[in-house]
């Protein structure tokens, strides 16, 4: 079977092309990809090529498919996996299979598996490590967002706290504690707000910062202070770009003691310093944003490390259980990560979009891999609808859903384009 996919050949060399997939055989599974959400990690692959830790050295001659936040349906099953999968089953991928400690992952390392493709053959490692997960929903974009949501969930689980005089680490955020999300209204920050408000272990105070008023206002319109209050959380949005002394102001918002849990969403020295500066005694700083620069450093107050037990954690991905939690919460209506999505497009726009990802404003770019469609901002549907009835209808649908991409919009788009 032929697939159409975006493959990387080296630094700044992505190509959309068609090629033949290997036969599935007895020990394989083939899947049809419906949706993939683009991640900044794919931009890092684009920039670094074979220098990226997850990308093989020989991609110039054996290119790999990019995209790791994907969802679709099982298309063919070898007899050795027939007990577990059947044709037509929905699936999502947990790319971080960690087989024997390896960094290889779909969307980075495999010639025949990645999200920006029409059809893929699932790697043996993914199957063996139980990372091809069942997805019992016909809303595909939620499945694509299960992977980024699992990264957020993993972050909450990776936070830890200590006990003075005891050699114990208590895992997770402080239940009923104080939490701050710095540079926290990008797509991953929005997902974090959603999870913080609706998970079973939540803060009593949540402060979210950024330096962009428009992004803060959008976040506040989706996750309102009033809704947070109904969840038992005192939510504040703060533009630190307008503050003379952000650390002082943020500490004052905490009541002067600082924050138990702080997540830093930007690999920017100033933001890291602010994150460190607002930690409470035994405060945990999670450096969520992976820097592209191997030499990136930022100061940390080691007086507070010694006397106040401040400490750092870092997470780059979730695990399979985190993804299962994300799927369960989405299916139960407890999470709605649609706020992360600001653009939609088809497979034909992936190369240009990935290459320019940092320059394109907004949040997640959602790709429907079975169609061709220029990258289009949800905010531009109304304008495009003046000449295109499809976009006029999509605009009507999303307006009824607080301006967010939704199941009805997805179903309408695919019914028109497939």
Predicted segments — roles?
Residues 163, 244-249, 257, 270-277, ...:
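C-terminal hydrophobic helical "lid"/dimerization subdomain
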Residues 22-36, 51-100, 114:
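Glycine-rich beta-strand-centered segment in the early N-terminal region that forms part
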Residues 261-268, 277-296:
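ADP-ribose/adenylate-binding Rossmann-like module
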Residues 189-190:
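N-terminal Rossmann-fold NAD(P) dinucleotide-binding loop
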Residues 148, 184-186:
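Glycine-rich Rossmann-fold phosphate-binding loop(s) that bind the pyrophosphate
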Residues 273, 289-309:
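Rossmann-fold NAD(P)-binding glycine/threonine-rich loop
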Residues 57, 97-177:
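NAD(P)H dinucleotide-binding glycine-rich loop of Rossmann-like/cofactor-binding domains
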Residues 176-177, 182, 193, 197-271:
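Adenosine-nucleotide cofactor-binding segment
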């Amino acid at each position: 079977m032929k697939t159409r996919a975006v493959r990387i050949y080296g630094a700044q060399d992505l190509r959309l092309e068609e090629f033949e997939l290997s036969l599935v055989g007895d020990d394989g599974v083939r899947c049809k990809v419906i949706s993939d959400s683009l991640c900044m990690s794919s931009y890092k692959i684009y920039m670094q090529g074979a220098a990226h830790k997850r990308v093989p050295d020989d991609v110039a001659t054996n290119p790999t498919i990019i995209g790791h936040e994907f969802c679709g349906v099982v298309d063919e099953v070898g007899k050795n996996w027939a007990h577990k999968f059947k044709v037509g089953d929905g699936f999502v991928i947990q790319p971080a299979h960690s087989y024997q400690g390896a960094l290889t992952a779909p969307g980075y390392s495999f010639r025949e598996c990645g999200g920006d493709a029409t059809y893929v053959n699932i790697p043996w490692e993914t199957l063996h490590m139980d990372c091809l997960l069942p997805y019992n929903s016909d809303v595909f974009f939620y499945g694509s967002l299960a992977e980024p949501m699992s990264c957020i969930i993993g972050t909450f689980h990776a936070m830890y706290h200590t006990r003075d005089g005891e050699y114990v680490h208590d895992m997770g955020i402080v239940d009923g504690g104080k939490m701050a999300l710095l540079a926290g209204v990008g797509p991953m920050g929005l997902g974090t707000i959603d999870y913080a408000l609706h998970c079973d272990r939540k803060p009593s105070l949540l402060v979210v910062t950024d330096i962009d008023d428009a992004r803060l206002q959008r976040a506040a319109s989706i996750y309102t202070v009033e809704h947070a209050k109904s969840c038992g959380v005192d939510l504040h949005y703060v533009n630190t770009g307008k503050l003379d002394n952000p650390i002082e102001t943020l500490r004052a918002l905490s009541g002067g003691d600082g924050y138990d849990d702080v997540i830093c969403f930007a690999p920017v020295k100033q933001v890291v310093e602010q994150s460190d500066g607002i930690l409470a005694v035994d405060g945990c700083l999670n450096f969520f944003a992976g820097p592209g620069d191997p030499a990136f450093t930022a100061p940390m107050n080691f007086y507070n490390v010694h006397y106040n037990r401040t400490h750092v954690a870092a997470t780059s991905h979730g695990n399979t259980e985190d993804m299962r939690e994300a799927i369960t919460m989405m299916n139960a209506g407890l999470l709605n990560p649609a706020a992360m999505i600001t653009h939609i497009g088809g497979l034909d726009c992936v190369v240009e979009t990935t290459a320019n990802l940092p320059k394109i404003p907004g949040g997640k770019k959602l790709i429907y891999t079975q169609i061709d469609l220029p990258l289009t901002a949800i905010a531009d549907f109304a304008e495009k609808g003046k000449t295109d009835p499809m976009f006029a209808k999509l605009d009507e649908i999303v307006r009824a859903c607080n301006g967010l991409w939704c199941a009805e919009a997805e179903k309408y788009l695919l019914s028109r384009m497939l």
